[in-house]
Amino acid sequence: MNASHPAVHPVGVPPAVAGQLPPRMRMKEIQGMPGTIGGLLLRLGQFCFALVAFSIMVSIENFSTVTAFCYLVAATVLQCLWSLALAIIDGYALLVKRSLRNSLLVSLLVVGDGVTATLTFAAACASAGITVLIGNDLRQCKENHCARYETATALAFLSWFMVSLSFILTFWLLATR
């Protein structure tokens, strides 16, 4: 008899039953998703851009007289807190080699990224509108700090772009589960 017996020749994977699909392979981790180095870099970029935008806006003495600029400050503070917390989680996951593929956690990340992206984008757009009004329409850049307003607004847009990338990648991860 030429048949192999499991006790003599162990088989690592049981043979496929007729009509049964082979087990699905997990796709390799795409950089930028939670728990990857790319994801950590995106979170750190979001944090840095939002922090610098916040710092520039707060350094202007009369920013609080314009509601859109106050909104930008509030949105960048929220973005800083969210991005820093998730950068710490990503860094910890990388250090202990844990996957952040839990569907409840991924759902929370999608909602949080979506909310912070929307708030940051709205604040950056409002600030850009006021900056254009002050600089181009009213031509009052001599009395105001147009260059600093523009820089803070541009950095808020960069932070929004990076959180949007995180949102898209995390949403894709959630949708392909």
Swiss-Prot record:
Glycosylation sites: N62
Superkingdom classification of source: Eukaryota
Signal peptide: none
Primary location: membrane
Extracellular domain ranges by topology: 58-68, 125-153
Chain ranges passing through the membrane: 37-57, 69-89, 104-124, 154-174
The keyword rRNA-binding is annotated on this UniProt entry: no
Record Pfam families: CASP_dom
Assigned keywords, A-Z: Cell membrane, Glycoprotein, Membrane, Transmembrane, Transmembrane helix
GO cellular component: plasma membrane
Stretches assigned to the Cytoplasmic side: 1-36, 90-103, 175-177
Cellular compartment(s): Cell membrane
Membrane topology recorded in Swiss-Prot or TrEMBL: Multi-pass membrane protein
Family, per entry: Belongs to the Casparian strip membrane proteins (CASP) family.
PANTHER family the UniProt entry points to: CASP-LIKE PROTEIN 5A1 (PTHR32021:SF1), CASP-LIKE PROTEIN 5B3 (PTHR32021)
Quaternary organization: Homodimer and heterodimers.
Protein name: CASP-like protein 5A2
